[in-house]
Amino acid sequence: ILNTKGILRLIESVPSPKAEPFKMWLAEVGRERIDETIDPELTIERALETYLKKGYSREWINQRLQAIQVRKELTDEWDSRGVKQGVEYAILTDEITKAWSGMTTRQYKNLKGLTKENLRDNMSTLELVLNMLAEATTTEISKEKNPQTFVDNRKVAKEGGEVAGNARKDIEERTGKPVITSKNAVDFSNLISDVIDTEYDKNE
């Protein structure tokens, strides 16, 4: 079974003229990636453009881009502690998610009806903010406690998540409604469209 890389290499090797549009697209994507390596700001601009095309609000996009930065700071901290990318990243992320949301990452994705989609891309603004709080707090606790082993890092991840978990419970107590929602990107896009349509009707 071919993976994504294998499929792309197969397309490149096809001599048929029908494959030319795909080859041109691959070349364009490659050029964009090189440009982004030279000027990282292009990555942010491209992400902003992509989210806008998907129908997200600017408020949500600003939070999402900030969440990317918070996540990067956390993974940089993990790297400095010897945490391995892949399985160990996933375990620590799961620890954080479970501590603040009460669910594992998989359970959270199931709630939103997701398979391979990015969970953060399907969070509400408040969910994103709490997830950021959990990750940013984990980073700060790690810097202070200087964990030496993976077990230590796991404890720190749980502590960071619990801070955001307490904030979530406080919000829910004060608002009388759950923070975590089954709504995903499709629902958010539809909501934005409805608001735009309503405003348009008012101005007609």
Can you name each region flagged by the protein language model?
Residues 2-6, 12-204:
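Positively charged, phosphate-engaging catalytic surfaces used for nucleic-acid and nucleotide handling
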